[in-house]
């Protein structure tokens, strides 16, 4: 299969608040907006990144699946300066902190916050892994 695009779609009844959150804190811009669906795009890098927000009661969702996302989802944001993002998002903007900033032996410096829907957001800077974890990577690091 040739994939032309791939992006998460968050099912939530908080369409407007969710779109505002990702625009204000993560630099996304609206590319399509209806009362039941918002398509967002972040063009700060190449390739650009997309995220959509959809009312779970919309007719395009199969009947048995029409419910808001409720846990079990983490969106990872890899950034150049995780410490600066921590300062901006946690210290200044006051977003909730679920996992304080720390280095992981498998090759990440990160912290975890969440969006208005309770979706976890893992803000990550890739760092060199420990020797033990370096062997687990397919490509040498």
Language model feature labels by segment:
Residues 1-6, 29-77, 86-114, 126-141:
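Vicinal oxygen chelate
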Residues 12-14, 105:
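Conserved beta-strand-loop-alpha-helix junction that forms the acyl-donor binding cleft
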Residues 14-15, 80-82:
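Helix N-cap motif at beta-to-alpha junctions
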Residues 18-23, 89, 118:
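Conserved active-site tyrosine of GNAT-family acetyltransferases
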Residues 122-123:
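Short glycine-/small-residue motifs
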């Amino acid at each position: 299969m040739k994939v032309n695009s791939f992006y998460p779609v968050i099912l939530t009844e908080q369409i407007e608040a969710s779109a505002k959150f990702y625009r204000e804190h993560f630099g996304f811009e609206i590319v399509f907006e209806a009362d039941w669906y918002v398509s967002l795009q972040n063009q700060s890098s190449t390739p650009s990144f997309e995220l959509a927000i959809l009312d779970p009661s919309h007719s395009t969702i199969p009947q048995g699946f029409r419910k808001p996302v409720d846990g079990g989802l983490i969106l990872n944001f890899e950034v150049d300066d995780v410490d600066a993002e921590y300062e901006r998002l946690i210290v200044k903007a006051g977003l909730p902190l679920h996992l304080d900033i720390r280095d992981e032996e498998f090759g990440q410096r990160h912290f975890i916050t969440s969006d208005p829907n309770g979706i976890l957001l893992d803000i990550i800077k890739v760092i060199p892994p420990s020797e033990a974890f370096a062997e687990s990577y397919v490509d040498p690091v």
